[in-house]
């Protein structure tokens, strides 16, 4: 399953992304972030992290360097 998602993202990068101007505000790009997050954390958590990152990638966000975290911090319940 992991390889399927990575293959789909790479297909997007190869065939769809070149049709648009580069607009990603982050480094690494959102697609590279998604691939790394899925490789490191699996399909569910990695896809969730990539979705949150893509939702932050808009003209009103400053962007910048935002790597995939080494470990995902769990939210503490009070």
Curated annotation (Swiss-Prot):
<keyword id="KW-1003">Cell membrane</keyword>
<keyword id="KW-0997">Cell inner membrane</keyword>
<dbReference type="Pfam" id="PF01809">
    <property type="entry name" value="YidD"/>
</dbReference>
<dbReference type="InterPro" id="IPR002696">
    <property type="entry name" value="Membr_insert_effic_factor_YidD"/>
</dbReference>
<protein>
    <recommendedName>
        <fullName>Putative membrane protein insertion efficiency factor</fullName>
    </recommendedName>
</protein>
<comment type="similarity">
    <text>Belongs to the UPF0161 family.</text>
</comment>
<keyword id="KW-0472">Membrane</keyword>
<comment type="function">
    <text>Could be involved in insertion of integral membrane proteins into the membrane.</text>
</comment>
<dbReference type="GO" id="GO:0005886">
    <property type="term" value="C:plasma membrane"/>
</dbReference>
């Amino acid at each position: 399953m992991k390889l399927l998602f990575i293959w789909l993202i790479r297909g997007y990068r190869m065939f769809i992304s070149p049709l648009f101007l580069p607009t990603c505000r982050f480094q690494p790009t959102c697609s590279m972030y998604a691939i790394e997050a899925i490789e490191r954390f699996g399909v569910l958590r990695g896809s969730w992290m990539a979705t949150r990152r893509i939702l932050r990638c808009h003209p009103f966000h400053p962007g910048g360097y935002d790597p995939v975290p080494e470990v995902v911090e769990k939210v503490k319940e009070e």
